[in-house]
Amino acid sequence: MAKEFGRPQRVAQEMQKEIALILQREIKDPRVGMMTTVSGVEMSRDLAYAKVFVTFLNDQDEAAVKNGIKALQEASGFIRSLLGKAMRLRIVPELTFFYDNSLVEGMRMSNLVTTVVKHDDERRVNPDDEKED
């Protein structure tokens, strides 16, 4: 019977914490900035590859996001070496960084719902406006 929370998930969870600390304390690249959040890590079953999902505080500008991801990808070797010192793994996984737009999409959906609710409340207050012929 397979475990619900296997080794790849446990390693990914610990790696997420360590990468967040490394980005906060060690990376000095201005393209990355101080406000980079590691929103998730997905590990391969053999623990050789890791997809790291990040978000940026200034993610309004698409060019800044692309530059941030590029900077992280260029620093992946350095991050990987620091990760190897922080975690005891036989193989330190190859890191690939991706922009996680789920936070932005969630905020967009929340704004849409708020707009619809506000419009619905206005229609309830003024029902005569809708039935004009």
Curated annotation (Swiss-Prot):
Keyword Protease: no
Pfam families per UniProt: RBFA
PROSITE patterns named in the record: RBFA
GO molecular function, one term: ribosomal small subunit binding
Organism superkingdom: Bacteria
Keywords: Cytoplasm, Ribosome biogenesis
InterPro entries, per the entry: KH_dom-like_a/b, RbfA, RbfA_dom_sf, Ribosome-bd_factorA_CS
Family annotation (Gene3D superfamilies): 3.30.300.20
Subcellular location: Cytoplasm
Single GO cellular component term: cytosol
Main location: cytoplasm
Biological process per Gene Ontology, one example term: maturation of SSU-rRNA
Cytoplasm in keyword set: yes
Task of the protein: One of several proteins that assist in the late maturation steps of the functional core of the 30S ribosomal subunit. Associates with free 30S ribosomal subunits (but not with 30S subunits that are part of 70S ribosomes or polysomes). Required for efficient processing of 16S rRNA. May interact with the 5'-terminal helix region of 16S rRNA.
Family named by the database record: Belongs to the RbfA family.
SUBUNIT field: Monomer. Binds 30S ribosomal subunits, but not 50S ribosomal subunits or 70S ribosomes.
PANTHER family: RIBOSOME-BINDING FACTOR A, CHLOROPLASTIC-RELATED
Name under which the protein is recorded: Ribosome-binding factor A
Gene expressing this chain: rbfA
